[in-house]
Design a protein with these regions (language model features):
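ATP-binding N-lobe of GHMP and related small-molecule kinases
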Residues: 1-62, 149, 251, 255
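Hydrophobic anchor at the start of a short beta-strand
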Residues: 5-7, 47-48, 144, 186, ...
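A short glycine/serine-rich beta->alpha loop
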Residues: 12-15, 61-70, 204-211
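Acidic, low-complexity central loop/insert segments
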Residues: 63-175, 213, 217-261
Length: 261
């Protein structure tokens, strides 16, 4: 018998109240992969399912409308908001990803939530500037890089905001190339000023589902640049999102706002 399903709707990484990337946190319900994919596709929204084992381990299972994902940080912020509401006196809440058993620490700082995690291995793929330009439709201004905090990203720097928002790549081609190489899409970004960046994520097949905020890309960019950063995202989809990262010894923190919708 399944535990009755409870669904929480949240918006995450919003730069202002009412803004953010939507996610559904699901407790209980049918745990089969087919049911989870069906729910994510039916709601047309990123879903994260919370599973609690008898030993107290909390596992998080991420599903996009078109595929399962090893890690999604805006959905993890949503999980943090749900779990801290349940246990408001907790200082740190530990969870584990369902696909790869990656351990994540959830923290709260005022009205914001952070995920502490570490750099992960990336596929051994040599991506040339010409290949990146063909995939994205514009020439990168620095060598493309691969980095990961649990969901490998190809990071491609573009010239400026105009170049970033002119991008209209072939999403099906990016998805096929990503599957072939074990990479979860392309993150295009540019430098606004010292320590401040703006980007767009190309991972979903449907352009209407472009992320307003991509925490795993912010983490990957932090690793690639070797510095803490402030990252804006979402203007392409009418949103206004803000992701903050901090290097924390051998780990890093990725966080921002999470609010119940």
């Amino acid at each position: 018998m399944h535990i009755p399903e409870s669904i929480h709707a949240l918006i995450c990484f919003g730069a202002r109240p009412g803004e953010g990337n939507p996610a559904l946190v699901v407790e209980g319900g049918d745990p089969s992969p087919q049911a989870r994919q069906r729910l994510a596709r039916g709601r047309n929204t990123t879903c994260v399912f919370i599973d609690e084992d008898g030993d107290g381990t909390v596992r998080v299972d991420y599903w996009y409308p078109h595929m399962r994902s090893p890690l999604c940080l805006h959905a993890t912020l949503a999980v943090a908001a749900v779990l801290f509401r349940r246990t408001p006196d907790a200082e740190v809440i530990a969870v584990e990803t369902a696909m790869h058993g990656q351990r994540l620490a959830l923290l709260r700082d005022g009205d914001d939530y952070f995920v502490r995690l570490a750099a992960q291995a990336v596929p051994q793929v040599d991506v040339t500037a010409a290949q990146a330009a063909a995939l994205l439709g514009t020439a990168p201004v620095s060598p493309p890089r691969l980095a990961s905090v649990g969901s490998p990203k190809l990071l491609v720097e573009v010239r400026d905001a105009a170049a970033l928002y002119a991008l209209q790549p072939d999403l099906a081609w990016i998805a096929a190339w990503s599957r072939q190489h074990g990479i979860n899409g392309i993150y295009a970004w540019y430098r606004c000023e010292d320590g401040v960046y703006e980007g767009r994520n190309f991972n979903h097949l449907d352009p209407a589902l472009e992320d307003a905020a991509t925490g795993v890309a912010a983490g990957a960019l932090t690793i690639a640049l070797g510095r803490s950063l402030v990252l804006y995202q979402g203007r392409a989809v009418g949103g206004d999102c803000l992701i903050r990262t901090r290097i924390d010894g051998p780990a890093l923190l990725v966080g921002g706002a999470a609010a119940f919708a």
